[in-house]
Amino acid sequence: MPKIAVLGAGINGIASALAIQERLPNCEVTIIAEKFSPNTTSDVAAGLIEPFLCDDDVDRIINWTSATISRIHEYQADGNPGAEEQSGYWLQSVKSEPKWLKLMKNVHILTDAEMKQVARRPEHKFGIFYTTWYLEPTPYIKWCTDKFLKNGGKFKKQKIENIDDVARSYDVTVNCTGLGSRALIGDKEVYPTRGQILKVSCPRVKHFFIDDKYYALLNDSTITLGGTFEAHQWDLTINSELSQKILKENIHNIPSLRTAQILSSHVDMRPSRGTVRLQAELGRSLVHNYGHGGSGITLHWGCALECAEIVENVLKMKKSKL
């Protein structure tokens, strides 16, 4: 029975492991990580489904996102929490209608009259209303984890310092360590983009609101207010002044947030990279799936399915050489 190690237990690690099990049920899959949910970078995310801070081929982005949307429908069909449609406004200083909008529902370019009603700043010159989804990572990761364990998967808590030491014990190793890949495999193309957010409660807010700098995104019982996009910043200290600014600026966009109850503040680092690295490494039984920027939730299932296919091909190549 082939043995597969998946390094990293965020949403891309657990999804890749589960996709491998489903595609290759004769394999033994082990997830190895130092941190597990709810203490991963994924758990901090609001789970808005749309590509964000991810510069990659648009067709790949659309295919991966489409697969994730189908996955959300499957998750919803089981009556699980933390996944629902959300509608709202994207206001822009420069007009943009990306191709991925075709995956969204109820897309409507705002008229001048509509813009006058929703614009809050001089830079709010163009706007789009649409319906997308949110997928709250923590309950979803638990759902995936339950499936993974039911399929015979294993977990191993370990700080990974040398990938070759791990790889010796497995037929294929899958690297889903995100920003950790910078130190683990020496990929200097992956870097942190610091993000600080607030979680608040405000039932009066019914629509998401995104502009060039700030956002308010809906979840089941909370709203995520952001945010910051600080490239190459490693500081995980919560800046209280910045939290106040995030709240103030979102209130400017959505006056109803004046009544919001602040629940918590969070900061983490998005694993940014010029493109997602989803490939087998030549000459090694090593597959990479990392560098999703701010789109880890959005792209996760499409990338996981492709990752599983790559793992299958690596195993076939190894078998053919025997």
Swiss-Prot record:
Enzyme class name: oxidoreductase
Amino-acid positions noted as binding FAD in the UniProt annotation, renumbered to this chain: 9-11, 34-35, 40-42, 46-48, 159-160, 177, 270, 293-294, 296-298
Name of the protein in its database record: D-amino-acid oxidase
Cofactor dependence: FAD
Subcellular location as annotated: Peroxisome matrix
Protein's gene: daao-1
Taxonomy of the source species: Eukaryota, Metazoa, Ecdysozoa, Nematoda, Chromadorea
Molecular function as annotated in GO: D-amino-acid oxidase activity; FAD binding; glycine oxidase activity
Disruption phenotype: Mutant worms (tm3673) exhibit decreased egg-laying capacity with smaller brood size and lower hatching rates at 25 degrees Celsius. Worms do not show any change in physical appearance.
